[in-house]
Swiss-Prot record:
InterPro entries from the UniProt entry: ATP-Sase_PUA-like_dom, PUA-like_sf, Rossmann-like_a/b/a_fold, SO4_adenylyltransferase_pro, Sulfurylase_cat_dom, Sulphate_adenylyltransferase
Family, as annotated: Belongs to the sulfate adenylyltransferase family.
Name of the protein: Sulfate adenylyltransferase
GO terms, molecular function: ATP binding; sulfate adenylyltransferase (ATP) activity
Class of the enzyme per the UniProt entry, highest EC level: transferase
EC numbers: 2.7.7.4
Pathway named in the protein's UniProt entry: Sulfur metabolism; hydrogen sulfide biosynthesis; sulfite from sulfate: step 1/3
Catalytic activity reported: sulfate + ATP + H(+) = adenosine 5'-phosphosulfate + diphosphate
GO biological process: hydrogen sulfide biosynthetic process; sulfate assimilation
Gene that this polypeptide is encoded by: sat
Alphabetical keyword list: ATP-binding, Nucleotide-binding, Nucleotidyltransferase, Transferase
Length: 402
């Protein structure tokens, strides 16, 4: 009997990726079906369904699911879900009952098939207000929703591919079944997920080590899908994180892995989604720091912590591990948090993303109190290869790694 948290919904993992003869047969059938091009976000969502990360979904959401999730975190069947998982199109001719091949618009690869059970329109501004708390087109998540097609399509899917994530990231691209097997092998049952879309600096290292003190282990779980233009690419982040783990974490306390979603930058709602799919990966806790999954000033620094107290009790088995803002304090002589350090901001070493970017692009060393030298070297190498124009666009934001 597994001691790990159960997958979301309380049943078994439900990966929708076909294998063997079923995969060969469906691929052959898909080749003759009308094609629907998916955005990067939609492709990532489909792959998550394929590997079981979005258990127990069996496809893209219906209008009543969309409405229920937007307005009350609940699908029609009563399942807790914090963000709509939808597929859109501008194609007027598609109708209920149609069978479609789902194609990654960027690569042209057929990623899955779908039987359309519902074609509907939505109030995009309503989704933005409910999920992102704003309709400001400067918000990358709002921009993404507003760029969707005129219609949403719902229906069960069969997944045929996970794209090139395995080829690009090798063992780091782990499915929920694989992380669960690894946790079992390690004898772990209390596992904290550390969500990251950035390289890990000293403050992130400190957060993970706080969790290690009370947990069996930590899953450092990096986003491998698309970010905002200018964010550091996943392969560079992965190398920087691996370098930190190899040099500064005790053996058998951390597993590094990645997942295929794009960032939505939905702040509190995205923190709930992060906890939900970490439950499928086998994690009992999600570390939630300052400004988790946020962007700009759209959310309060700890809104993503507060939202866990606002959802119905028992919605998720994976629970939040709240940790305050962390930094190096000169007077304390080490890493500290707002909760433990009595000193003023003048005693704290805080670097803005702009400052970090400027130092790295000029080949300067970052303060050792801010970043480990081995990590800084990985980033310096990346920045050295950028043109001046690219350099301006690269962003390192927020004190949270999320």
């Amino acid at each position: 009997m597994s001691k790990l948290v159960r997958p979301h919904g309380g049943g078994e993992l439900k990966p929708l990726l076909l294998t063997g003869d079923a995969l060969s047969a469906e691929k052959a059938r898909a080749a003759s079906l009308p094609q629907l091009k998916m955005s990067s976000r939609e492709t990532g969502d489909l792959i998550m369904m394929g590997i079981g990360g979005f258990t127990p979904l069996d496809g893209f959401m219906t209008k009543s699911d969309w409405q229920g999730v937007c307005d009350g975190y609940k699908m029609t069947n009563g399942l807790f879900w914090p963000i709509p998982i939808t597929l859109s199109t501008d194609d007027e001719s598609i109708k209920d009952g149609d069978e479609l091949a789902l194609v990654d618009a960027e690569t042209g690869e057929i990623m899955g098939t779908m039987k359309v059970t519902d074609k509907y329109t939505i109030d995009k501004a309503h989704e933005c207000m409910q999920v992102y708390k704003t309709t400001d087109m400067e918000h990358p998540g709002v921009k993404m929703v507003m760029a969707q097609g005129k219609y949403n399509l719902a229906g069960p899917v069969k997944v045929l591919s996970t794209g090139n994530f395995k080829e690009e990231y090798g063992e780091q691209f782990m499915t929920p079944a694989e992380t669960r097997a690894k946790f079992e092998q390690m004898g772990w049952s209390r596992v904290a997920a550390f969500q990251t879309r950035n390289p890990m600096h000293r403050s992130h290292e400190y957060l993970a080590k706080i969790a290690i003190e009370t947990m069996d282990g930590v899953l450092v779980h990096s986003l491998l899908g698309a970010l905002k233009p200018g964010d550091i690419p996943a392969e560079v982040r992965s190398e920087a994180i691996a370098t930190l783990i190899d040099n500064y974490f005790a053996p058998n306390t951390v597993i590094q892995a990645g997942y295929p979603l794009d960032m939505r930058y939905a702040g509190p709602r995205e923190a709930l989604l992060h906890a939900l799919f970490r439950q499928n990966y086998g994690c009992s806790h999600l570390i939630v720091g300052r400004d988790h999954a946020g962007v700009g000033d759209y959310y309060g620094p700890f809104d993503a912590q507060k939202i866990f107290d606002e959802i119905p009790k028992g919605s998720l088995e994976t629970v939040n591990m709240n940790i305050d803002w962390t930094f190096w304090c000169k007077k304390c002589g080490g890493m500290a948090s707002q909760r433990t350090c009595p000193h003023t901001k003048d005693d704290r070493i805080l670097l803005s993303g702009t400052k970090v970017r400027a130092m790295l692009s000029e080949g300067q060393d970052l303060p050792v109190e801010f970043s480990r030298p081995e990590v800084a070297k990985v980033l310096q190498k990346y920045y050295a290869g950028l043109s001046a124009e690219q350099n301006v666009k690269v962003e390192l934001k927020g004190h949270s790694a999320a």
